[in-house]
Structure formats: C-alpha cells, structure tokens
C-alpha cells in the first residue's frame, strides 16, 4: 500500500514538472488534474510545452499535418464569441475578466449546457509562424466554419434552457449572403458591376443620327451665351451645329459619338424619338438588380 502511494506521488510530481500552454488564455497554466483543463477559463484546449514549441519563442516555423493539428488551426481562425455568445466569460482574451465574470455568474450556465465538464478539444501539437501574435484569419475557412455551425445550431435548443442556441439571433440573415473578407466583397462588387453594365439606353439608329438637322448659330444665341453642353465651348456666329428633336444644340463632333453609344440627349435624357429614357433606365436597372439577386442565390458559395 505504501509502495502504491509512493508511486502515485512520483507520478503526480512528474506531471507537475510538465509545462502546459492554454490557447484561450494565451499563456502558461497549471492544469487541473486529472481532467487536464485550464484553471482560468475551464477549457480543455491546452497542450504540453516542449523545447521546440513555436508559440513561446522566435525562429522558424514547422507544420504538422495531423488531423488534430488541422482542427486546432481551424479553431484558432474562428471567432468563438460570434457563435458562443453565452460563453463570453470562458472565451474572453483576458484571464482576469474570465475569472471575474465566472465568479459573478457562477458555474450554473457552464453545467446547464455542457454538464459537469467543459467541452474538450482534441489535444495536439499546434504550430504557426513564429513572431506572429495570432494566425491570419482566412475568409474561406471562416465562411466554411460558419456554414457548419449554422447547420448545427439551426434547430438545436436545450429543453428548459433559458438560452437556446439560435442562428437567427447571431446573424441578421442567411450566412451565405454575407461577404466573408475582402475577397468576398470584391466578388460581389464585380458581379454587381457586371450586371449593371450596358443597362443604359441602346445606341441610336444611324439613319436618325445622319438625319439630324444642321443649323447655324445666330447672333442672338451668342449674346445669350449659348455653348455646347458636351465640350462647354461657346458658339460663334454662323457656326454650324447639330440640333436634336429636344431643341438642344451640339457640335457634330461632340454629339455623334455619344449618340452612337446612347440614344439619349446628354442634357434632358430624351431619345431621338422624343421619349423620356429615364424611366426606361430605371426599369432596366431594377431588372438587373433582380437578376443579380437571383444569381446570388444560385451562386456556389463554396467556390474559392
């Protein structure tokens, strides 16, 4: 019996001699035994510190291709408080705040959701580039994880719990409609510009352009300060200009290239037929907006 006690004491001393690092608290801790959980945040996301642990010193970097390492990297990219808002005391980056909030709320919330022990994450070596305070957040990885959690929490609620998980309370719409990072935002803007391209009035008919009357500028018009609306140059007496059906005057070299692209007056937006092209443009833009919305719903959000 005495020998067993001595052996247990030696084992405890050996464990105590080991150093452990908590990835939630971002510091060394002495884990609670035998569960191996952090005494500050009550999480199991800790690992043993070795001489080559990359998160404690500077130098090169190493990569571990094990499954547990991949999960640890994904978990590190994830903004935990976005999903577990009721567990902010346990996921806060400040150990003092964690201790204070945990004392105020007690362990009732903790035990209601997870039982007597907190959720344990797979323990494995976790490496990232040394000299960096935290890993770079990947929009693609974060989007995938949020989709996974969206499906997991969609219909989950703990009976009798005052805080059932609800994805609708975390985001204001479908997570797939969000732009994850700068890349996602650029893709949306590019698609929107593509939908709105060529939504203005179509080119004017060439016969109508050539049939526009050519008139000469009078002294009265010069005295009124009449100018070309395109180049803003003042007209001179007896200068030849082109007159549109809306009675606006332009230099031929200014208005013809415009009409070859848009059947509309640059001043009043009326077409050569005398119709108001503003309403046509609005209806075309609305149609393009609806097309963009439908395409967004059918877009494969897992392509990156």
Curated annotation (Swiss-Prot):
> Under what name is this protein listed?
E3 ubiquitin-protein ligase RNF115
Q: Which domain of life is it from?
A: Eukaryota
Function of the molecule: E3 ubiquitin-protein ligase that catalyzes the 'Lys-48'- and/or 'Lys-63'-linked polyubiquitination of various substrates and thereby plays a role in a number of signaling pathways including autophagy, innate immunity, cell proliferation and cell death. Plays a role in the endosomal trafficking and degradation of membrane receptors including EGFR, FLT3, MET and CXCR4 through their polyubiquitination. Participates together with BST2 in antiviral immunity by facilitating the internalization of HIV-1 virions into intracellular vesicles leading to their lysosomal degradation.
Gene encoding the protein: RNF115
Mark the residues carrying the PTM Phosphoserine. 132-133
Keywords for this protein: Acetylation, Cytoplasm, Endoplasmic reticulum, Golgi apparatus, Metal-binding, Nucleus, Phosphoprotein, Transferase, Ubl conjugation, Ubl conjugation pathway, Zinc, Zinc-finger
Known catalysed reaction(s)? S-ubiquitinyl-[E2 ubiquitin-conjugating enzyme]-L-cysteine + [acceptor protein]-L-lysine = [E2 ubiquitin-conjugating enzyme]-L-cysteine + N(6)-ubiquitinyl-[acceptor protein]-L-lysine
Q: How is it modified after translation?
A: Phosphorylated by AKT1, allowing association with the 14-3-3 chaperones that facilitates associating with TLRs. RING-type zinc finger-dependent and E2-dependent autoubiquitination.
Which GO cellular component terms are attached? cytoplasm; cytosol; endoplasmic reticulum; Golgi apparatus; nucleus
Instruction: List all Polar residues biased stretches.
Output: 279-296
Compositional bias of type Basic and acidic residues: which residue ranges?
98-110
